[in-house]
């Protein structure tokens, strides 16, 4: 297992859940956290602990976003009209790295961030190398012509473990995707239950 995979699956082990629904997750074989003390029975979490865990799980799912960046996203979500938890999910799903992952151009969130940083993605015909770039409905995302035959791309499009959600239209023959709309929490194909309302409670303490 590579260092990148180890870091990724460490999040699974810490949460005790296969948060991306990957067949190779070690949580599929055991239900305790990482490290030598991972097998110890855990007591019931306090309300604060439950809220913190919900935040850590969502941050981890989106390739371990830093606390500073995640809190900034939360603040932005609170400024928008409507439910803050729903807005939080909407902003996260509009991130370019999330859309690249959802479109099955790469196999993981972590790979999507690296793929974008290395300049393999265009938005509306222009190269964008910022993973946190906010995609808008109607935007067209594409893999650069020179990158379409990379093994990481060809393998990802064949993954049977997940489908492209209906708020994204993907054409793998052309390696393009169109972002149709901002999804609601219920639209997002999370492998485990995400609870943004608990994150709102956490930051509202």
From Swiss-Prot:
- Start and end residues of each S4 RNA-binding domain: 94-157
- Record region (Disordered): 18-46
Say yes or no: keyword Protein biosynthesis present: no
The biological process GO terms on file are: ribosomal small subunit biogenesis; translation
Q: Name one GO cellular component term.
A: small ribosomal subunit
Q: Which UniProt keywords apply?
A: Ribonucleoprotein, Ribosomal protein, RNA-binding, rRNA-binding
**One short Pfam family name for this protein?**
S4
Q: Which CDD domains match?
A: S4 (cd00165)
The record's annotation in Gene3D superfamilies points to: Ribosomal Protein S4 Delta 41, Chain A, domain 1, RNA-binding S4 domain
What Gene Ontology terms describe what this protein does at the molecular function level?
Answer: rRNA binding; structural constituent of ribosome
Q: Report the family membership.
A: Belongs to the universal ribosomal protein uS4 family.
Known function: One of the primary rRNA binding proteins, it binds directly to 16S rRNA where it nucleates assembly of the body of the 30S subunit. With S5 and S12 plays an important role in translational accuracy.
Quaternary structure and partners: Part of the 30S ribosomal subunit. Contacts protein S5. The interaction surface between S4 and S5 is involved in control of translational fidelity.
- Which protein are we looking at? Small ribosomal subunit protein uS4
**To which species is this protein native?**
Bradyrhizobium sp. (strain BTAi1 / ATCC BAA-1182)
**Annotated gene:** rpsD
């Amino acid at each position: 297992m590579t260092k990148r995979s180890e870091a990724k699956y460490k999040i699974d082990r810490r949460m005790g859940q296969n948060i991306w629904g990957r067949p190779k997750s070690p949580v599929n074989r055991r239900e305790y956290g990482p490290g030598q003390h991972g097998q110890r029975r855990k007591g019931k979490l306090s309300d604060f602990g439950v809220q913190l865990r919900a935040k850590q799980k969502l941050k981890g799912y989106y390739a371990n976003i830093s606390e500073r960046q995640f809190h900034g996203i939360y603040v932005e979500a609170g400024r928008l009209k409507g439910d803050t938890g729903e807005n939080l999910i909407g902003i996260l799903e509009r991130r370019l790295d999330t859309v690249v992952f959802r479109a099955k151009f790469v196999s993981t969130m972590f790979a999507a961030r690296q793929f974008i940083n290395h300049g393999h993605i265009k938005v509306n015909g222009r190269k964008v190398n910022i993973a946190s770039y906010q995609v808008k409905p109607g935007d067209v995302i594409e893999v650069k012509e020179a990158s379409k035959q990379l093994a990481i791309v060809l393998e990802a499009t064949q993954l049977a473990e997940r489908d492209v959600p209906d708020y994204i239209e993907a054409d793998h023959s052309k390696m393009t995707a169109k972002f149709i709309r901002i999804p609601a929490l219920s639209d997002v194909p999370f492998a485990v239950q995400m609870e943004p309302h608990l994150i709102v409670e956490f930051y509202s303490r």
